[in-house]
């Protein structure tokens, strides 16, 4: 079993050294996906920002957080601005 693992490692290392795997030269690390955002009460959320689409049903602290982080501020009777 160790022999098989060793041979697979050597074969993959040889391909990398010959440039068969990464033909573009320097390769950047793959970016991490954004963290999972839990939906807040009050409706669907916007893309990756964690703030509901409407101002209805969110707490004061959630509204203040969306306003300070993203500039999406709730106004009484008007909904979001910004």
Swiss-Prot record:
Residues 1-19 form the signal peptide. Higher expression in hemocytes and to a lesser extent in heart, testis, gills, intestine, lymphoid organ and hepatopancreas. Traces in eyes and subcuticular epithelium. Not present in the brain. GO terms for biological process: defense response to bacterium; defense response to fungus; defense response to Gram-positive bacterium; killing of cells of another organism. It is found in: Cytoplasmic granule. The N-terminus forms pyrrolidone carboxylic acid. GO terms for molecular function: chitin binding. It comes from the Eukaryota. The modification Serine amide is found at residue 81. Disulfide bonds join 51-66, 55-73, 67-74. InterPro entries: Penaeidin (IPR009226). The modification Pyrrolidone carboxylic acid is found at residue 20. GO terms for cellular component: cytoplasm. Keywords: Amidation, Antibiotic, Antimicrobial, Chitin-binding, Disulfide bond, Fungicide, Pyrrolidone carboxylic acid, Signal. The keyword Cytoplasm does not apply. Belongs to the penaeidin family. Antibacterial activity against M.luteus and E.coli bacteria. Antifungal activity against N.crassa and F.oxysporum. Presents chitin-binding activity. This is Penaeidin-3a.
